[in-house]
Amino acid sequence: MPDLLGYNTNGHFFTVELKVTKGKKLKFSPHQIAFHVTHPNNTFIIAEALGPRAVNRFQMYRGSCVVELAACGLELEACCLGLDAIRDFLYQLGA
């Protein structure tokens, strides 16, 4: 089960999995991967990259990319970079 259940002003529910990493890899349990594979729509993963070499501290990925994200880590292209862009993206869901 994801960490957050959100609801925006457009009447759309969405879920968010939160991850923190000091490197480029993200760790997912088999249950987390299965959830995102089973529910690929309106599910998202937000990763916070820590450390002095973190270029884009907050990155958001679609849940449908969880298998690739587990394999490639933060090398995978994010759908949003930065908290402002993430907020705006989630706010616009269903518009």
Question: Across the structure, where does each feature detected by a protein language model lie?
Answer:
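Charged phosphate-binding loop/patch that engages nucleotide di/tri-phosphates or the phosphate backbone
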Residues: A71-A95
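Intrinsically disordered, low-complexity regions of eukaryotic proteins
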Residues: L5, K19, L50, A70, ...
